[in-house]
Amino acid sequence: MKTAETTTMTAKKQPILKQPRALSSNPQMVFLRARIFLLIGFTFILPLLSRAEPEPAADARPRLAVPFTETSPALQADPKEEIWQKAAIIPRLGLAINPDKKGPEPLPTEVRLLWQAETLYVRFISVGPGFHVPYGNKHDAKHYEGDVVEIFLDPVGDARQLIELQVNPEGGVLDLMFLATATPQSGPYRMLTHEFLQRDWWTRQEWNFKELRVANSRHPLPDGSTQWIADIAIPAKEILRRRGQEKLSPGEFKANFLRYAGAVDPATGKRSEELFMNWSPVRHGCPHLSPEALGTLVLEKADPPK
């Protein structure tokens, strides 16, 4: 925020002129003086008052410190695997922003993260009454029409490239890349403006994550619900190309984590309710149009050898 410059002016001392007493009771002079005082107030006092007003609170975005791991996770979606106990944890996902409708309570969802130089590891632990998987393990299908977990990544942090990854409970993957051909312009909810989307936001559906590894498992819980674990290993060289790097290192990059769920109409086999959850809040159904709405991952340094 720029600091307003204060200019001090030293007025020359003027002789005191005595006015006739009758002048102060002249209505025209009284009105003129009142206007002068009001003008002084608007010119000098109001700017000071406005400067004293606190700045609007920034649209805070979440941050998470992610520990380095010497041991690679087994990528078997094993709920008892101990290495995940050392991971950074996002304990819950909140509902996406939907000003048109108040959604139900979010379903229990936890995200865990670890990193090595070659890989970013992500584990989703999702609980629900059941999971809708209309496209099975087909690649690049519309998996968002069923139950999925989603990852959005912007390793450079300038909102010019957005990588999207969706994974469903049967191992189906949808991977996309979005590219901006100009400086992003966002409106409400940090969603790209209509004009920008029409002109400068490009989707590359033909792009695929090379060497991506995914593992899933499902486990019945005592209350009748089901736990779904998705382990995802993201190769560093696939997300660091714009940096000119192939390995992760301590530092920051932008990310978001989401889950799509909702009740299904048995008659149609389609969703009768949309339950969209996210780590960093985005407009309902529009995370792929909100590259400036991501949170921040802070990759921590490895512990020195003992």
Regions found by a protein language model. Name each.
Residues 7-13, 17-18, 48-60, 305-306:
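Basic/polar N-terminal segments that are highly enriched at the extreme N-terminus
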Residues 1-33:
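N-terminal secretory signal peptides that target proteins for export/translocation
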Residues 17, 22-24, 29, 40, ...:
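Intrinsically disordered, low-complexity segments enriched in proline/serine/threonine
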Residues 53-306:
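Structural preference for beta-rich elements and adjacent junctions enriched in aromatics
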Residues 34-47:
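Bacterial N-terminal signal peptides
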Residues 32-34, 50, 146:
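Residue-level micro-sites within transmembrane alpha helices that shape
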Residues 16, 23-24, 43-45, 88, ...:
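Alpha-helical transmembrane segments and their juxtamembrane interfaces
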Residues 30-32, 48, 60, 256:
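Short alpha-helical segments used as structural interaction elements across diverse proteins
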